Amino acid sequence: MAVPARHTSSAKKNRRRTHYKLTAPTVTFDETTGDYRHSHRVSLKGYYKGRKVRDDTK
């Protein structure tokens, strides 16, 4: 079984972990529906870039 040749110090470990971050989701206000939605996604009411692209009638 492989074993590390040197002990990883806490400073080295913490420097490596500085890049493990959570990013906030990009949420924009949709002028057409008045709701918030993710960027580059169809809104829940079926609008994208101000146009109706999905019909919800079933």
From Swiss-Prot:
<dbReference type="InterPro" id="IPR002677">
    <property type="entry name" value="Ribosomal_bL32"/>
</dbReference>
<dbReference type="GO" id="GO:0003735">
    <property type="term" value="F:structural constituent of ribosome"/>
</dbReference>
<keyword id="KW-0687">Ribonucleoprotein</keyword>
<feature type="region of interest" description="Disordered">
    <location>
        <begin position="1"/>
        <end position="23"/>
    </location>
</feature>
<dbReference type="GO" id="GO:0015934">
    <property type="term" value="C:large ribosomal subunit"/>
</dbReference>
<dbReference type="InterPro" id="IPR044957">
    <property type="entry name" value="Ribosomal_bL32_bact"/>
</dbReference>
<keyword id="KW-0689">Ribosomal protein</keyword>
<protein>
    <recommendedName>
        <fullName>Large ribosomal subunit protein bL32</fullName>
    </recommendedName>
</protein>
<comment type="similarity">
    <text>Belongs to the bacterial ribosomal protein bL32 family.</text>
</comment>
<dbReference type="Pfam" id="PF01783">
    <property type="entry name" value="Ribosomal_L32p"/>
</dbReference>
<dbReference type="InterPro" id="IPR011332">
    <property type="entry name" value="Ribosomal_zn-bd"/>
</dbReference>
<feature type="compositionally biased region" description="Basic residues">
    <location>
        <begin position="9"/>
        <end position="20"/>
    </location>
</feature>
<dbReference type="GO" id="GO:0006412">
    <property type="term" value="P:translation"/>
</dbReference>
